[in-house]
Amino acid sequence: MLAAITLGPTLYLLVTSLTPLSLVNPRTAYDFSDPTQNYRAAFVDPRFLNSVWVQVKLSIATVVLQLLVGLGVALLLNMRSRFLEAVRTAFLIPMVLPPIVVAIIWKIMYVTDVSPLHRALAFIGLPVSSLISNADTALWAIAAADTWEWFPFTMLMVLAALQMIPDEPIEAAKIDGAGRLQLFWYVLLPYIQPTLVVAGLFRLIDSVKAFPLIYVLTNGGPGTVTEVTNYYAFVQALNFSFWGYSSAIATLMVAGVLLLSWIIGRLGADRRLDD
């Protein structure tokens, strides 16, 4: 039963991707005369290929930023203190907010007429245009919002790894005269590196779900600068009624996510063997 509930919609998506289904002509739902036409069309569609490239850029930017910010915050909070325990809890707030709420918060931050960020910049003599309306900054603006929402995930994983490091190597390094940078690079980083890799892979998979941010902040614009693959599939289905083609795009995304999941599984298995 559970397998049917899980796999049923995915199988139906795959079946639909093999048809030229369009709401303009619903009878094509059972037309399997050319089952690969949508996939052939996707691989020569410049807009689809651009959406894949945009997704790659956004995923890399968000994963790198989330790892850096999460690591930095975890290092700052890696002390036993009641005050810091309260601070850690506060840092989790963005991660537990509904994605649409996060998107609305950042919409307010980026719209120049109401944005406290833009008003502060204008007050100190640094007025800037809307970050989400500028083709050069729109993708970075989305990456910043996604980082704010999800860096607590990396922070939690790294913090847990840091607190499992035994005291002996740290004390030995301090006795040998290691500075903070040397202590981090030669002692802490080797311990937490596997955690960073796993956290990065999990966030890489999850980065394909930035749809609410893009829908609320930019609608894929300016132009197609922030049009990632899942948003392009949405446009093909809801705006143009090309459900077969949209399903093919979604199926390709599922295949990519499954591949990344397999990589995570292999890394986890290799780590257990090493242990």
Where are these regions (language model features)?
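A structural signal for multi-pass alpha-helical bundles of membrane permease subunits
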Residues: 1-275
